[in-house]
Amino acid sequence: MIYYIVALVIILLDQWTKWLVVRHMEIGESIPLLDSVLYLTSHRNKGAAFGILEGQMWLFYIITSIVVIGIVYYMEKEAKHDRVFATALALILGGAIGNFIDRIFRGEVVDFVNTYIFTYNFPIFNVADSALCVGVGILFLKMIRDERKAKKEKNA
């Protein structure tokens, strides 16, 4: 149950921050937070990461629905006794639903975190995107750890 609360907190934080951007900023407006490094920039994305598949909303609806159903299934069946796995899935679930809400009600995703890494202007993102990336990163690291553990047990 706690993991669904984590997902809900991600969704609420994501939607609240997007609401603030939509309400208080014009599209394209940028507010420096840390000059040359971090900006709040009001941006809209009609596609996926990096703007790919722009205008393919029906595809996002189908994929997101399948992903959400799969995550809930795994949270109920597989992750009950694995806190790391459940946390990763909760982050992914919250992020997926956060962006799904935008696609359903706005027809686009509100992005606003604009960072520069050295001279590279990283694609603008939001709270949901961050949760998705952290969740996937945790899953990736968990898979590596589990694989190493299985090899170690096999060789013992």
Curated annotation (Swiss-Prot):
The active site is at 111, 129. It is a multi-pass membrane protein. GO terms for biological process: proteolysis. Disulfide bonds: none annotated. It comes from the Bacteria. It is found in: Cell membrane. GO terms for cellular component: plasma membrane. Coiled coil: none annotated. The chain crosses the membrane at residues 52-72, 85-105, 121-141. GO terms for molecular function: aspartic-type endopeptidase activity. The keyword Lipoprotein does not apply. Pathway: Protein modification; lipoprotein biosynthesis (signal peptide cleavage). Its main location: membrane. Keywords: Aspartyl protease, Cell membrane, Hydrolase, Membrane, Protease, Transmembrane, Transmembrane helix. It catalyses: Release of signal peptides from bacterial membrane prolipoproteins. Hydrolyzes -Xaa-Yaa-Zaa-|-(S,diacylglyceryl)Cys-, in which Xaa is hydrophobic (preferably Leu), and Yaa (Ala or Ser) and Zaa (Gly or Ala) have small, neutral side chains. Its EC number is 3.4.23.36. It is an enzyme of class 3 (hydrolase). The keyword Cell membrane applies. NCBIfam families: lspA (TIGR00077). HAMAP family: LspA. Belongs to the peptidase A8 family. This protein specifically catalyzes the removal of signal peptides from prolipoproteins. This is Lipoprotein signal peptidase. The gene is lspA.
